[in-house]
Amino acid sequence: MNRNVFLKNTVILTGASLALRGIGMVFRVYLAAQIGAQGMGLYQLITTVYNLALTIATAGIGIAATRMITEEMALGGGQRLRSLCKKLLLASLVLGLLAAGLQFFGADLAAGLWIHDERAALSLRILALSLPVIAVMSCLQGYFMARRAVGLTTGAQMAEQLLRIALIMAILPAALGKGLGEACAAVVLAGTAAEVVSGGIVWWGYRRDLRQVPGSGKNVPAKGVLRRLWSIGAPVAATRYVGSTLRTLENVMVPGCLAVFTGSRELALEQFGALKGMAMAVLFFPFSFLTTLSTLLLPEITEAYAQ
């Protein structure tokens, strides 16, 4: 382990994570002022369903990519790296397209049966378009984590957040007069566009970095990639699928229970938006430190085990 690199990456990731969460919380205040507590409640329900699809698209891919690429660089000298990355990216894209198809074509069903609000369907379809991009980005982030080069992905995340905020502030006022459904659609459209731009930045950085890896130009075929990907990613994915499903069910049930208690679906959405949109964001703010350390330790432990 190169301690200087590890400490540098820890500082970069922790600082960026804190900055992103801080900017996000401040922006939530602006967003809540624009669309109201009820709009925040609807938006949170939309993201609840989206997060389930996001788990299907990305669970296990980033961790598997980090481990497999770290092992290849430690033992294989990078000769099979190009072939390995192609197969990992293809698997990521397939999962992303699968999740996108499920969410896009199941948007009406999810809006009616889970969210109990037909206004959510348009936003779910828009968000589905971002899933293939995010799935591929998850794999590329695993690549850069294995390379101990987190600067590019961190910069892309910062650019994504700032672009998302700028786009929301630009297009949201025009959608506010059309209803909460259209307002939420404007918010997620801005987020989807920002994801695509961020994905393009990371892809450009990956293509540039791969050429600099010693031995990567030989393009030696990597064998057993899918089997190895399954053995690493399946347990992680299964755990996250269960956790994400339970969280989705919980978040879907809470507004219904609040509606029974208050006697009003609108008031229930307002209370749910205040809870999930603001209070929980503040509560989970300190987890930035734990997430950073656990992420950075993975390639170090993998390399030590491989050697």
Kindly give the residue locations of the regions a language model identified.
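Short membrane-interface helical motifs at transmembrane helix boundaries
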Residues: 98-121, 175
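N-terminal membrane topogenesis motif
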Residues: 1-23, 79, 83, 219-243
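Hydrophobic alpha-helical transmembrane segments
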Residues: 155-170, 178-208
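Interfacial/gating helices of multi-pass transporter permease domains
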Residues: 31-52, 184-185, 224-232, 255-284
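Helix-loop junctions and terminal segments of transmembrane helices
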Residues: 59-74, 283-307
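Residue-level recognition of pore/gate-forming positions within transmembrane alpha-helices
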Residues: 17, 21, 48-51, 87, ...
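Interfacial transmembrane-helix starts/ends
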Residues: 7, 44, 77-94, 226, ...
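Alpha-helical transmembrane segments of multi-pass membrane transporters/permeases
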Residues: 10-18, 124-125, 129, 144-170, ...
